[in-house]
Amino acid sequence: MDSATGALALEDGTIFAGFGAGAAGIKVGELCFNTAITGYQEILTDPSYASQLVLFTFPHIGNVGANAEDHEESTVEAADAARGAIFREPITAPSNWRSTEDFGVWLARRGIIGLSGIDTRALTKRIREKGMPKAAICHKPDGKIDFDALVELARSWNGLDGADLADVVDQDAPFEHTEGLWQAATGHQTALANAEFHVAVIDFGVKKNILRNLASAGARATVVNGNVSAEEVLALKPDGIVFANGPGDPAATFERSGEMIKTLVASGLPILGICLGHQLLGLALGAKTKKMAQGHHGANHPVKDLATGKVEIVSMNHGFTVDPDTLPPGVEESHRSLFDGTNSGLAVKGKPIISVQHHPEASPGPQDSFYLFTRFAGLMRDYRAK
């Protein structure tokens, strides 16, 4: 394409030329696709997407613009989330009462490279059939693109296997969170100072809406990073512990934080694990994790609650999964993906533990699993009553 100002190069040498948007430059990452129709701002600011390039299957991106409220990173350290965004059509002009910024301008300000004019259906099919490749994306406004160099960059990148990316996006210093869920009439609610519970959130790249859901469930959250010791966490005297979401290979993060997680599990305190936190809990309980071929990324994934038989439509964003064949005695699957049968939740006999692979906080996505935060509050209430 002679007029191309952007391109995507895969590690196998395949090149997709198109039109650059957002930030100029070159970045490498793992290419995945996301099937959500809306919520692109939340997706691209989710720290779980660190070192990834997101291909949107929905063709029109940008129609609700961007704003200062719908970002999901909780700290400055977590701002380096997705590196690139690929879409079929040029960025759509914003038309939404909450929009304060054009999406292309927002991409540039965030340092995210955009690429349009791509056959996203063909690229999505390729990922489904061959898995998530290493890739390089570029935006060159002058059109001077070295395609061979892009391919070499993609091939030489280390990839996500063995990468402890949670250590990149978690915050350095502890902080308190009291902001609740957003309401159309009042904006974000503020949790009362006399919140019923105090929760310690272990930050591996925590999404802001997890913290908001905790606040709305009556919990004041103290957020600490994954390098703290179990003794430091227990010194906070929490009523419960949350192992948060995050990016990268769970086995690599477990090498750094595993002993802390095992000790906290042994403490008997109520625990909620989400996404990477769920995988880390699985490792702490004796299971193993494995890399997925194309992962789960979207806001329309059906999972089944194996205890009730209820089917929930949930948001998912992960490229690794707990291997259910490695679960030790006393640990059972609680939820399962109805797309491919992979694990989406764990339950532990005799312990107040809720652990799910999907994102009950949504943002973006359906609210079918919001009840898990209320259930977690119930576990803390029961534990306190002992």
Swiss-Prot record:
Any GO BP annotation: 'de novo' UMP biosynthetic process
Q: What is a single molecular function from GO for this protein?
A: ATP binding
Give the binding site residues for L-glutamine: 48, 246, 248, 276, 279, 317, 319-320
Pathway annotation from the record: Amino-acid biosynthesis; L-arginine biosynthesis; carbamoyl phosphate from bicarbonate: step 1/1; Pyrimidine metabolism; UMP biosynthesis via de novo pathway; (S)-dihydroorotate from bicarbonate: step 1/3
- Coiled-coil stretches noted in the UniProt entry, renumbered to this chain: none
Q: Which SUPFAM superfamilies is this protein grouped with?
A: Carbamoyl phosphate synthetase, small subunit N-terminal domain (SSF52021), Class I glutamine amidotransferase-like (SSF52317)
Task: Give the record's keywords alphabetically.
Answer: Amino-acid biosynthesis, Arginine biosynthesis, ATP-binding, Glutamine amidotransferase, Ligase, Nucleotide-binding, Pyrimidine biosynthesis
The record ties this protein, via CDD domains, to: GATase1_CPSase
E.C. code = 6.3.5.5
Instruction: Specify where the region named CPSase lies, as residue ranges.
Output: 1-194
Q: Pfam families in the record, alphabetically?
A: CPSase_sm_chain, GATase
Claim: Amino-acid biosynthesis is one of the keywords in the record: yes
Active site (record annotation): 275 (nucleophile), 359, 361
Which part of the chain is the Glutamine amidotransferase type-1 domain? 198-386
Q: Name the catalysed reactions.
A: hydrogencarbonate + L-glutamine + 2 ATP + H2O = carbamoyl phosphate + L-glutamate + 2 ADP + phosphate + 2 H(+)
The cross-references to InterPro entries, in alphabetical order and at most eight, read: Anth_synth/Amidotransfase, CarbamoylP_synth_ssu, CarbamoylP_synth_ssu_N, CarbP_synth_ssu_N_sf, Class_I_gatase-like, CPSase_GATase1, GATASE
- Specify whether Amino-acid biosynthesis is a keyword of the entry: yes
- Say which domain of life the source belongs to: Bacteria
Q: What class of enzyme is it?
A: ligase
Q: What does this protein do?
A: Small subunit of the glutamine-dependent carbamoyl phosphate synthetase (CPSase). CPSase catalyzes the formation of carbamoyl phosphate from the ammonia moiety of glutamine, carbonate, and phosphate donated by ATP, constituting the first step of 2 biosynthetic pathways, one leading to arginine and/or urea and the other to pyrimidine nucleotides. The small subunit (glutamine amidotransferase) binds and cleaves glutamine to supply the large subunit with the substrate ammonia.
Family, as annotated: Belongs to the CarA family.
Q: How does it assemble?
A: Composed of two chains; the small (or glutamine) chain promotes the hydrolysis of glutamine to ammonia, which is used by the large (or ammonia) chain to synthesize carbamoyl phosphate. Tetramer of heterodimers (alpha,beta)4.
* Name this protein carries in UniProt: Carbamoyl phosphate synthase small chain
**Species whose genome carries this gene:** Hyphomonas neptunium (strain ATCC 15444)
Organism ancestry = Bacteria, Pseudomonadati, Pseudomonadota, Alphaproteobacteria, Hyphomonadales
Question: What gene name does this entry carry?
Answer: carA
